[in-house]
């Protein structure tokens, strides 16, 4: 034990005399992406965007919502629909949500995959917008009874 202590003291004196610094280990980066969306870009950079809405367990960033809203409103303005679907179509608000804009309202799918809806299966989640393209709310079939909707958080 005395030899070990002596060796340690000798090592400390060598470091002190030489002026060499012993670097502290770099702290590990802790990245908590919930409730955020996270992507690794082709450049290798990590990006995260905060959730604007959460539908069930799906986080939607403002950029994902804007993409769905803009596409839905574009179809609406053109009098067109996504593929052979009926979207966007009028949303009647049978659930009685309190929207910030006046009716008529329209619904358009927002996909959990991050892609913009162009037809096919619409999934459970929707952006609701007015006839001027203003976002009102995100709603989902997840957690609702029958074919009803509940508000996303």
Swiss-Prot record:
Extract the signal peptide range.
Answer: 1-20
- EC identifiers of the protein: 4.6.1.24
One of the entry's Gene Ontology molecular-function terms is: RNA binding
Disulphide bonds in the chain: 51-59, 55-152
Q: Write down the chemical reaction(s) this protein catalyses.
A: [RNA] containing guanosine + H2O = an [RNA fragment]-3'-guanosine-3'-phosphate + a 5'-hydroxy-ribonucleotide-3'-[RNA fragment]
Q: What class of enzyme is it?
A: lyase
Domain of life, per lineage: Eukaryota
**SUPFAM superfamilies annotated for this entry?**
Microbial ribonucleases
Q: Which residues form the propeptide?
A: 21-49
Q: What is the similarity comment for this entry?
A: Belongs to the ribonuclease N1/T1 family.
Q: Please report the name of this protein according to its UniProt entry.
A: Guanyl-specific ribonuclease N1
The organism's lineage is: Eukaryota, Fungi, Dikarya, Ascomycota, Pezizomycotina
């Amino acid at each position: 034990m005395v030899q070990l202590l002596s060796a340690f003291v000798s090592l400390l004196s060598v470091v002190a005399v030489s002026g060499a610094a012993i670097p502290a280990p770099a702290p590990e980066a802790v990245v908590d992406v919930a409730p955020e969306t996270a992507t690794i870009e082709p450049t290798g950079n990590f990006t995260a965007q905060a959730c604007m809405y959460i539908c069930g367990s799906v986080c939607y960033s403002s950029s994902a919502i804007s993409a769905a809203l803009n596409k839905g409103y574009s179809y609406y303005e053109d009098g067109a629909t996504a593929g052979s679907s009926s979207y966007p179509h009028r949303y009647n608000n049978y659930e009685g949500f309190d929207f910030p804009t006046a009716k008529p309202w329209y619904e358009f799918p927002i996909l959990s995959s991050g892609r913009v809806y162009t037809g096919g299966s619409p999934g459970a989640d929707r952006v609701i917008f007015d006839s001027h393209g203003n976002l009102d709310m995100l709603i989902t079939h997840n957690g609702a009874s029958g074919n009803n909707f509940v508000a996303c958080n």
